Curated annotation (Swiss-Prot):
Cofactor: Mg(2+)
Species of provenance: Aeromonas salmonicida (strain A449)
Domain of life: Bacteria
Gene transcribed to yield this protein: engB
Domain EngB-type G: 27-201
Role played: Necessary for normal cell division and for the maintenance of normal septation.
Pfam families, alphabetized: MMR_HSR1
Alphabetical UniProt keywords: Cell cycle, Cell division, GTP-binding, Magnesium, Metal-binding, Nucleotide-binding, Septation
Name this protein carries in UniProt: Probable GTP-binding protein EngB
Length: 217
């Protein structure tokens, strides 16, 4: 049975936080967007939610320094994580972002899925592979979006998707690879369907855990 697609344009901003200690309670289901600072993360969030300015886009990569939290409905949240891998920021600031990102990924129990974005022309950089390997170790479902797919014609685009799928095949079946373009709406519906399924699965997992705790009591 097909999962009903959530209405992502009902999303609203909740808070921005420098680290997990400033986030709301760690309950419900969160799906986080992560990627290098020039991967088109903010544009993807804006396109998914049909909110032009939900996530701020900037011509200067590395401007997203905070964990930004948005809520679709009670218990279902989207998270815009700080961009990683941009060289032209002070080392102290870069280390602070890395610590904030690592803490969220390792300790946030409500994190149930991760969308990792990469420029289709330059995928699988070292920092991208670190994210994928960590996700595989945690057995977290991942949707790898190869962004700016409009920059390639259909043949090379499909070849690049196949090449990336083959390159990460050893990391496990929980990583889904798709072409994506905010400009041409390539892959937007598939993204919405996948995330809707993750929210449903996450909510079911929480319900099962609550049931188990009641039985044990």
């Amino acid at each position: 049975m097909d999962t009903q697609t959530l209405n992502f344009n009902k999303v609203h901003f909740v808070t921005s936080a420098p680290d997990i200690r400033h986030l709301p309670n760690d309950g419900g289901v969160e799906i986080a967007f992560a990627g290098r600072s020039n991967a088109g993360k903010s544009s993807a969030l804006n396109t998914l939610t049909k909110h032009k300015n939900l996530a701020r886009t900037s011509k200067t990569p590395g401007r997203t320094q905070l964990i930004n939290l948005f809520e679709l409905e009670p218990g279902k949240r989207l998270v815009d994580l700080p961009g990683y891998g941009y060289a032209q920021v002070p080392l102290e600031m870069k280390l602070k972002w890395q610590k904030s990102l690592a803490e969220y990924l390792q300790r946030r129990e409500s994190l149930k899925g991760l969308v990792i974005l990469m420029d289709i022309r330059h995928p699988l950089k070292d920092t991208d592979m670190n994210m994928l390997e960590w996700s595989s170790h945690r057995e977290l479902p991942v949707m790898l979006l190869l962004t700016k797919a409009d920059k390639l014609s259909p043949g090379p685009r499909n070849n690049q998707v196949i090449k990336v799928r083959q390159a990460i095949a050893d990391l496990g079946p929980q990583i889904q690879v798709e072409a994506f373009s905010s400009l041409n709406n390539i892959g937007v519906e598939k993204l919405a369907q996948t995330l809707s399924g993750w929210y449903l699965a996450g909510a079911d997992e929480i319900a099962d855990n609550d049931e188990q705790e009641q039985v044990e009591e």
